Structure formats: structure tokens, C-alpha cells
């Protein structure tokens, strides 16, 4: 509840605060959810699933379709990386981290958010320019896969990174 003071006498009125704004922990939870969801999709493809695999296109699709030990190891490594990112985001919810541990946690999450925003943002921008016909790549373009990347897969990374950056900023603000 927020308090609003009206008039010279200081009459106080309590206004409800929207839960979405009041809960400063939602960005960390949302970032973790996006990380775990991304890891789940990658795990599905790593274990041989093919649903929506054609929307990825290019080398990632080829690697996932190979079903070799190397492709499994690569997929498993990506899953571990995404799960680790989700756990790091959840660690922002904890109260125990202080001093060097807290700085390391904030640095790791901050670095991850920058990487996600840069990767997702650049991919959305460049892919969008190609789809709009403003940039012509040297090779052939899988327009179907590119549309999925611009409007879903790469946008997912961009949103995940932006929400993670918000979680880091809120953790920094809460500690000061």
C-alpha cells in the first residue's frame, strides 16, 4: 500500500499498490523462467525431439538432427549453460550473498544480461533488416527460419537479457 497525503492537514489515504510493481523480485523470477524454458527446449531437441526444430534453421538445426555423440555433447553443454543462467538469476532472490560473493553474483548476472541483450538485439536488428530487404546477405536466406529468429528465438534472448538486467538493477538498488 502506498500512502498519499492530501491537503494542508495532511490527511493520509492508503492507495493499493499493484502487485506487479510492488514485488521487486519478479524480474529475477521471470529471467529464471525464461532461462529454464529455453533450456527445456534445447534439452528436447538434444534428446531427439524435432517439434519446431525447423524454425531454428542453419547450423543449430543440422547439429540437432545429426544424433551423434558430438551433437549430444554440444546440446547438453548448451542446456547446462542455460540452467546455470537460470540458477544465477534465482540467486538474485537470496539474501545471503554479501561482499565479494555478492559482487561476483551481480557481475555474473550483469555479464549474462549484456551478452543476451547484445546477441538477441543484434540478431533481431540484422534479421529484421534482411527481412525488410534493406540488407542483402551474400548467401541464400531461409526466410522461414529467419522470421522465427527475428520474432521469437532471438527476441526471446533480447527480452530475457533485458529482464535480467532489470533484476540486477533492482538487486543493486535494494542493497544501497
Task: Tell what function each PLM region has.
Residues 38-73:
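Hydrophobic transmembrane helix segments
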Residues 47-54, 94-97, 128-135, 169-176:
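Transmembrane helix-loop junctions in multipass membrane proteins, especially transporters and channels
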Residues 28-39:
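Alpha-helical transmembrane segments
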Residues 77-87, 151-167:
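Hydrophobic cores of alpha-helical transmembrane segments in multi-pass inner/ER membrane proteins
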Residues 59-61, 123-149:
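Interfacial non-cytosolic loop connecting adjacent transmembrane helices
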Residues 37-49, 114-131:
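C-terminal TM-helix exit segments that contain a strictly Trp-centered aromatic cap at the helix terminus
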Residues 73, 108, 141-160:
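Individual transmembrane alpha-helices with interfacial aromatic-anchor signatures
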Residues 2-24, 88-113, 173-176:
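Cytoplasmic juxtamembrane regions at transmembrane-helix boundaries
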Amino acid at each position: 500500500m502506498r500512502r498519499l497525503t492530501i491537503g494542508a492537514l495532511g490527511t493520509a489515504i492508503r492507495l493499493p499498490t499493484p502487485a506487479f510493481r510492488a514485488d521487486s523480485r519478479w524480474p529475477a523470477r521471470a529471467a529464471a523462467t525464461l532461462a529454464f524454458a529455453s533450456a527445456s527446449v534445447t534439452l528436447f531437441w538434444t534428446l531427439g525431439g524435432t517439434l519446431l526444430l525447423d524454425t531454428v534453421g542453419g547450423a543449430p538445426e543440422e547439429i540437432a538432427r545429426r544424433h551423434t555423440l558430438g551433437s549430444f555433447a554440444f546440446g547438453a553443454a548448451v542446456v547446462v549453460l542455460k540452467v546455470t543462467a537460470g540458477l544465477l538469476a534465482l540467486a538474485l532472490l537470496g539474501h545471503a550473498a554479501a561482499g565479494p560473493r555478492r559482487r561476483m553474483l551481480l557481475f555474473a548476472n550483469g555479464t549474462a544480461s549484456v551478452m543476451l541483450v547484445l546477441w538477441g538485439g543484434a540478431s533481431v536488428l540484422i534479421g529484421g533488416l534482411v527481412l525488410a530487404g534493406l540488407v542483402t546477405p551474400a548467401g541464400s536466406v531461409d526466410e522461414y527460419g529467419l522470421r522465427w529468429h527475428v520474432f521469437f528465438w532471438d527476441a526471446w534472448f533480447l527480452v530475457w537479457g533485458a529482464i535480467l538486467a532489470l533484476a540486477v538493477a533492482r538487486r543493486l538498488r535494494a542493497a544501497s
